[in-house]
Amino acid sequence: MVRNKSVFVVLLFSLFLSFGLLCSAKDFPGRRSEDDPQQRYEDCRKRCQLETRGQTEQDKCEDRSETQLKEEQQRDGEDPQRRYQDCRQHCQQEERRLRPHCEQSCREQYEKQQQQQPDKQFKECQQRCQWQEQRPERKQQCVKECREQYQEDPWKGERENKWREEEEEESDEGEQQQRNNPYYFHRRSFQERFREEHGNFRVLQRFADKHHLLRGINEFRIAILEANPNTFVLPHHCDAEKIYVVTNGRGTVTFVTHENKESYNVVPGVVVRIPAGSTVYLANQDNREKLTIAVLHRPVNNPGQFQKFFPAGQENPQSYLRIFSREILEAVFNTRSEQLDELPGGRQSHRRQQGQGMFRKASQEQIRALSQGATSPRGKGSEGYAFNLLSQTPRYSNQNGRFYEACPRNFQQQLREVDSSVVAFEINKGSIFVPHYNSKATFVVLVTEGNGHVEMVCPHLSRQSSDWSSREEEEQEEQEVERRSGQYKRVRAQLSTGNLFVVPAGHPVTFVASQNEDLGLLGFGLYNGQDNKRIFVAGKTNNVRQWDRQAKELAFGVESRLVDEVFNNNPQESYFVSGRDRRGFDERRGSNNPLSPFLDFARLF
C-alpha cells in the first residue's frame, strides 16, 4: 500500500512538472503565444482543467498560470519610452560608425511598440474582464472601462510622435548652437509639473538659470496649459498674478475672487487676467481640438517661484483641506468625521473617484453646464478681466502681416497689476517684420504656429565664448563688454511651434517667416508700465529718416542723399515687407560704391 502511494506521488509530481514546462514554453515555432501572454495563459488553464485530477490540483495549476501571466504582463508593460532611452544608451557603447544604424533600429522598434501598445493593452484588459467577472452587467462595465482607458485617448500617439520628431529635427551642430544662445529656449526647456492622460501643465525654466543676462526678468515665469477635448481642469489658486492668453481651441475660464465670480467663453486671442489668490477652473468645450493657453506668472511671495493650491484632489494633486487636522475640519465645517471621509482625498472618496490628477474627463452635458452664463470678451473695455486681442484694430498692418498690441495704459484692469503688455503678430510666408527695438520693455516671444527665424543684435556676446551661460565668468564678461563697447554679435535662432525667444530692451531685432508657411507669434512685454516705445530702423517710418542732414553725413561719411537712397528706398511698405529679389540690390553693391558700408549693414536684415 505504501509502495502504491509512493508511485502515485511520483507520477503526480511528474505531471505537475510537465505542466509547468508546458506553461513556461516560449519558443515553439509558429505559435502566436510568443507575442500574446494572455493566450498562453488561456491555453495553460485549459490544460489544467483537462489533465489534472481534483479541484485542489487544478486550482494550484491555474494559480501558477496566473502568476506567470502577471509577471509577463509586468515585463511587457514597461514604459516604451524608458526602453527606448535604454536602447539609445546601449548604442553609445558601439563604435562611432555603427551608432547611427543602432539608433535607427531603436527608433523603429519604439515606433512598432507604440503602434501595438494601445490595442494590445485593450485586448488583454478585455480578456481579463471575460474570466474575472461572472455577472454580465459587470463584464459590460469592465469592458467599457478598458475602452475608456486604452482607446479613448487619440492624442497619446500624437504626443509621442511629437517627441520623436523633436529628437530628430535638429543636427548635433545645430543643437549646440541653440544651447549656446542665452535668448533662445527650445520647447523642451519647459518642465512638466503635471503630465496626465487628459492634459499637461509645463513651466519654462527660470530665466536666470539659462543665463545671467536674463536675471532682470527672473521674477516672471512662463507656462503652457493644454487640456484635451471635453476635459475639466480642477479648481485651484496660485500665489501669483497671472495672464492667460488662449492660443488654440475654445473653452470656458471661470474664477472666483473674494467678491464675485467671473466666467468667460474663450477662443484664440482672448486674454484673461487671473488675480492672485483667485480660485480658477477651466473646461475645454471642443470635441476635437485641444485647449492651449500660454500663461504669464508674476509671483507675489518669492520672485520667480509660484505654487498651485488645490482644495479638491486625491494624491497628485493633493487636497490642501486634508492637511488640516481632523479636529479643525470637524469644527469649521460643523460636520461628522464620516462626512469628512466623503471629501476629496478622504477614505471613502478613493473608491468613487473617477480619476486622479489636475485634468479630468467630463461629459458633454457637464461641459455645456459649465459654459452657461459665461460671457464672450470683446476687443476693448475698461471693465472686466478679459478682452479679445485679435478683435482689436491691428497696431501695424499691411498685405505682409499684422501686429496686435494691448498695453497697461489702455487695459489697466487687465494688465496693470502684472506690468506687462500682450502682443500677437502674424507674418505671412516669405515676409519680414522689419528691424526695430523697444525702448523699455523686454519681450518674451512664443511661437504659436509656423516656422521662421529671428535675428538680433547683441553687445553682450561680441566675444566668442564656449559657454555663455557660465556664472563663474560673469564678472569678467561684464567688464570686457564695457571695455569693448560698440562691438556686437548677430544672434540667430530657428523658430518653430513651441519655441521661445527673449528680446531685451534696446536690442535691434527682426523676425522672418519661412518661404513655405506663415509665422504666428505671441509676446509678453515685461515692465511695459513704463510706457515702452517701439523704434523702427527700417521701413517707411524708420528712425534714420528723421535725422538732420549733417548728422547723416557725419555718421555715415557720405552725402546725405546716399543715406536717404538706402533708408528711403522702400517708401510704400512699412513694418512688414515681403522677401524680394536681391539681384538689383547686389548690382548696386560694388567694391567702388560709396554705399557699400551700409548696404552691408542693410543686408544684415
Swiss-Prot record:
Residues in Cupin type-1 domain copies: 183-341, 387-564
Lineage: Eukaryota, Viridiplantae, Streptophyta, Embryophyta, Tracheophyta
Primary location class: other
Record family assignment: Belongs to the 7S seed storage protein family.
Protein name (Swiss-Prot/TrEMBL): Vicilin GC72-A
Pfam families in alphabetical order: Cupin_1, Vicilin_N
Protein's UniProt keywords contain Electron transport: no
Functional description taken from the UniProt entry: Seed storage protein.
Record GO terms (molecular function): nutrient reservoir activity
Top-rank taxon: Eukaryota
Keywords assigned: Seed storage protein, Signal, Storage protein, Vacuole
Cell location: Vacuole, Aleurone grain; Vacuole
Gene Ontology CC annotation, any one: aleurone grain
Signal peptide span: 1-23
Region (Disordered) location: 52-81, 157-181, 465-485
